Amino acid sequence: TDCGILQRIKVKQQWAQVYSVGESRTDFAIDVFNNFFRTNPDRSLFNRVNGDNVYSPEFKAHMVRVFAGFDILISVLDDKPVLDQALAHYAAFHKQFGTIPFKAFGQTMFQTIAEHIHGADIGAWRACYAEQIVTGITA
């Protein structure tokens, strides 16, 4: 599956469902990170944001930043020049952290989306996340 226009629309629509407003955003982010840490228990990458406690104010602030970034990237999936600039910014920023498990995080996010949305198009998520976001952010 490619990240074509239909897949981008599905991803944007499903993101709007799962990451709607207010407290549900935090709840979704906590679900994603709890699922991620179950299969990727090494939290050393998150030491400076109190990664041992996903409920701490420091880690909640980190989650807000991470998911705000996803929100930006997903909102511009269909605007290639803006998407490319946003990805270049995030790629430059993340270089300071060394190797980041973007693929594993994506798999966890897909699983969590499927838990929150019946009939989620995980193929579209995999394609757009792998082809656009991971490829761009690791460039």
UniProtKB/Swiss-Prot annotation:
GO terms for molecular function: heme binding; iron ion binding; oxygen binding; oxygen carrier activity. Keywords: Disulfide bond, Heme, Iron, Metal-binding, Oxygen transport, Secreted, Transport. It comes from the Eukaryota. GO terms for cellular component: extracellular region; hemoglobin complex. CDD domains: Mb-like (cd01040). Heme b binds at H94. The keyword Iron applies. Disulfide bonds join C3-C128. Coiled coil: none annotated. It is found in: Secreted. Residues 2-139 form the Globin domain. The giant hemoglobins of worms are formed of a monomeric subunit and a disulfide-bonded trimer. This subunit is monomeric. Belongs to the globin family. This is Extracellular globin-1. It comes from Tylorrhynchus heterochetus.
